[in-house]
Amino acid sequence: WIMGHMVNAIAQIDEFVNLGANSIETDVSFDKNANPEYTYHGIPCDCGRTCTKWEYFNTFLGGLRKATTPGDSKYHEKLVLVVFDLKTGSLYDNQAYDAGTKLAKSLLQNYWNKGNNGGRAYIVLSIPNLDHYKLITGFKETLTKEEHPELMDKVGYDFSGNDDIGDVAKAYKKAGVTGHVWQSDGITNCLLRGLDRVRKAVANRDSSNGYINKVYYWTVDKRASTRDALDAGVDGIMTNYPDVIADVLSESAYTAKFRIATYDDNPWEMFKN
């Protein structure tokens, strides 16, 4: 999965997919009542990027729905996965459940079109704080209450705080999560970070009793770091330059081992060669 980083304006969906992304990451900020409010990152952000592009969250979902609904004039067949980077740092811990509830209602209405031919992309809820695991509970219980529990088949999870892998496993246990887990690791492109924790995550993914289904690394903009991440065995790379990742994937060293994921590749299943 080539994951376009910080896609917060509707116009950027086309831009990143046209550069080669089959997945995008979108920032979601919340108001003080835990309503998802804007797709917005703010300053500071990655080096070389404009930090302040934004839409209202529900407006963005409408654009995203069009981009992922077959038959729509804006449809991109290859856009198959969306990571919502949930900026829950502005919330109190006890608001996490409410944030999950409100997020589910927004997606149900504006993205899934109440289950009636809505957008088809797989969704990853990426949460920065392990203490906010109840966001997952709130999300799940709301879809059940709204009589669309089947939509959870399209939803996965990530804790993005680079926490100890054992601690992440405990948070999933509390949230009752037993699958659909993406594990992120990384740092802003302005700084360097080694691959030690990525290797631990990959080892967990590949073990018989691990909790991780997929591993992605962020934010990778250079060919050398792309090769290092691929050599470590990641499933996804988040980038500001999808064309760079696509270029490296077309090198002879990688064409035999990797291919770009399509809609038929289940993002919740471990890839077995």
From Swiss-Prot:
UniProt-listed Enzyme Commission number(s): 4.6.1.-
Active site per database record: 5, 41
Gene Ontology CC: extracellular region
GO annotation, biological process: killing of cells of another organism; lipid catabolic process
Cofactor: Mg(2+)
Pfam families in the record: GDPD_2
Superkingdom to which the source organism belongs: Eukaryota
Cofactor note: Binds 1 Mg(2+) ion per subunit.
Top enzyme class: lyase
Disulfide links within the chain: 45-51, 47-190
Reactions the enzyme catalyzes: an N-(acyl)-sphingosylphosphocholine = an N-(acyl)-sphingosyl-1,3-cyclic phosphate + choline; an N-(acyl)-sphingosylphosphoethanolamine = an N-(acyl)-sphingosyl-1,3-cyclic phosphate + ethanolamine; a 1-acyl-sn-glycero-3-phosphocholine = a 1-acyl-sn-glycero-2,3-cyclic phosphate + choline; a 1-acyl-sn-glycero-3-phosphoethanolamine = a 1-acyl-sn-glycero-2,3-cyclic phosphate + ethanolamine
GO MF annotation terms: lyase activity; metal ion binding; phosphoric diester hydrolase activity; toxin activity
Function per UniProt: Dermonecrotic toxins cleave the phosphodiester linkage between the phosphate and headgroup of certain phospholipids (sphingolipid and lysolipid substrates), forming an alcohol (often choline) and a cyclic phosphate. This toxin acts on sphingomyelin (SM). It may also act on ceramide phosphoethanolamine (CPE), lysophosphatidylcholine (LPC) and lysophosphatidylethanolamine (LPE), but not on lysophosphatidylserine (LPS), and lysophosphatidylglycerol (LPG). It acts by transphosphatidylation, releasing exclusively cyclic phosphate products as second products.
UniProt family annotation: Belongs to the arthropod phospholipase D family. Class II subfamily.
The protein, known as: Dermonecrotic toxin LsaSicTox-alphaIB1aiii
Biological classification of the source: Eukaryota, Metazoa, Ecdysozoa, Arthropoda, Chelicerata
